[in-house]
Amino acid sequence: RDDVESRGLGDVYKRQGEIPCYKVAENDKFFAFLDINPLAKGHTLVIPKQEVDYIFDLSDEDLAAMHVFAKKVALAIGKAFPCRKVGEAVLGLEVPHAHIHLIPMQNEKDMLFSNPKLKLTDEEFKAIAKAITMEL
């Protein structure tokens, strides 16, 4: 059996407490949490609670709502971690659950997923999540 639950992000919402998850924001349809292999402090993932592999399989209404939710989170990230812009990326090849990356950036190279990832402690992740949440 090859399903979202057995492979990754799809169940991150359902499996809170079982796997590392630093929540930033949540509503009835979407969940935002820190990427545990961040490119920058504040690198956040936004996912729909609905299990869907490909972001463009979401209904038009849900896709639009996801981007409005992501915008609120991105604005909070930008306040918590001053940057030129908060970049948005949708890749979706490694993780079989639709998600948006929100990454604080000073230049375009900050968005390269081949860049080294930050190694942060549990305390650092908690402080970053709190800083973003306080700006919402």
Model-derived features: where do they sit?
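Single conserved hydrophobic/aromatic residue that forms the stacking wall/gate
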Residues: 1-13
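N-terminal first-folded block
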Residues: 14-58
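Short histidine-centered catalytic/ligand-binding loop motif
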Residues: 45-67, 113-120
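A long amphipathic alpha-helix within ATP-dependent nucleotide-binding catalytic cores
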Residues: 64-81
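A short glycine-rich, hydrophobically flanked beta-strand micro-motif that places a catalytic Asp/Glu
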Residues: 81-93
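A short, glycine/Asx- and small/polar-enriched loop/turn
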Residues: 94-99
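Active-site-adjacent beta-strand/loop module that shapes the phosphate/pyrophosphate-binding cleft
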Residues: 100-106
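Conserved His + Asp/Glu catalytic blocks
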Residues: 107-136
